[in-house]
Amino acid sequence: MADDTTDTKSSNQMWGGRFASGPDAIMEEINASIGFDKKLFAQDIRGSIAHATMLAHQEIISAEDKDKIVHGLNTILSEIESGNFEFSRQLEDIHMNVEARLATLIGPAAGRLHTARSRNDQVALDFRLWVKEELQKTEQMLTGLIAAFLDRAEEHAESVMPGFTHLQTAQPVTFGHHCMAYVEMFGRDRSRVRHAIEHLDESPIGAAALAGTGYPIDRHMTAKALGFREPTRNSIDTVSDRDFAIEFLSIAAIAGMHLSRLAEEIVIWSTPQFGFVRLSDAFSTGSSIMPQKKNPDAAELVRAKTGRINGSLVALLTIMKGLPLAYSKDMQEDKEQVFDAAESLELAIAAMTGMVRDMTVNTARMKAAAGSGYSTATDLADWLVREAGLPFRDAHHVTGRAVALAESKGCDLAELPLSDLQAIHADITDKVYDVLTVEASVASRKSFGGTAPSEVRRQIAFWRARN
């Protein structure tokens, strides 16, 4: 598709009745948005068909003109989809490009399409439709990512790994439990997507420039035809509103943050020093100089995409923060932020779904690491509370002394002789060794939401029923 043509017709002929001369070339360049808003062509045509149909139903235009308009719009849709439509920068935007082509195809009837409509409510409609469709796509992609994690969680409900705080070994958990943490995160993202769809499910068309219209239009009819729950309730707010776009970017930023945290863990886990996972060749690259390298570039790029998404959110918030009601041309700068963030988010979710699905998990390496760093120290403290009757703070102190002794001897807690433990606290018996293995530690964490395999499987069943 060409971005520009050499025609001399411009949008000035659409709106320039009170102007004595045409715009400067620089004005045309800064004013034009067709380079990016042509992405809205399907939504623009769909909205125009619904509008024309309503106008005819209300006898504002004739049925004959409506039929010409609808046929012409469908012809334009086919031309754009097949790559046979020439977009003109002189015509500013997608609305004027479509209308100019419609006039060429069907003549004067094309001029009736814009009855009871402004580009202000037209672009609000097009953009809202596009964002709604993108949210629906995001919901489906998040569902796929959640499914990939559920499969890995089920596979590894009993696979022990170290749990971390401050990136230091904390307590043993299962890899399945760790996977389910991401299910919860991406489940919240999906819930936010669903709420956002609910928030924007109102049709802007019919608000006109800002005050509504004197024509007897039926906004409920167009809302229903376009798949909206109802029309918007205030015409000024309708053309002023870009909350739906900001909400999309907010959701994208939060989801991107979750993806970035996951990407960071994958990058760390795939290092030889950790060796917890091995990424498939399909989601790795090599080095141009070091033949041995297998780089987690997909994960690193997912991590980087988050920065772009965050930038888009801040950009649109900044664009909107000082605008008086109703429409201002500043709002033309809304779309590129959303388009770019949507593309980044789609790529990131797709890449992460593939990585999670295809990566190889080194359970032996994880289990070995789970026992390092005195990860069962909390289990010793809990045993002292249960079996020796110590207050937890006292048990914490006793356990700290045991850890210090083990460190000085270069051994694990379970390797300390009973005599050494009894020298720290006389009530310790040989039964304490039953809780000092990583398997026993994990199995004991049966509290709701805990890491015990039985609890992980309950969590998986809960999410399977909702995915």
From Swiss-Prot:
Subcellular location per the Swiss-Prot or TrEMBL entry: Cytoplasm
Entry keyword set: Amino-acid biosynthesis, Arginine biosynthesis, Cytoplasm, Lyase
Location, primary (coarse class): cytoplasm
GO biological process, one term: arginine biosynthetic process via ornithine
Claim: Cytoplasm is one of the keywords in the record: yes
GO cellular component term, pick one: cytosol
One Pfam family it belongs to: Lyase_1
GO MF: argininosuccinate lyase activity
Chain segments annotated as coiled-coil in the UniProt record: none
Pathway membership: Amino-acid biosynthesis; L-arginine biosynthesis; L-arginine from L-ornithine and carbamoyl phosphate: step 3/3
Reactions catalysed according to its record: 2-(N(omega)-L-arginino)succinate = fumarate + L-arginine
Enzyme Commission number(s) of this protein: 4.3.2.1
Recorded family membership: Belongs to the lyase 1 family. Argininosuccinate lyase subfamily.
The protein, known as: Argininosuccinate lyase
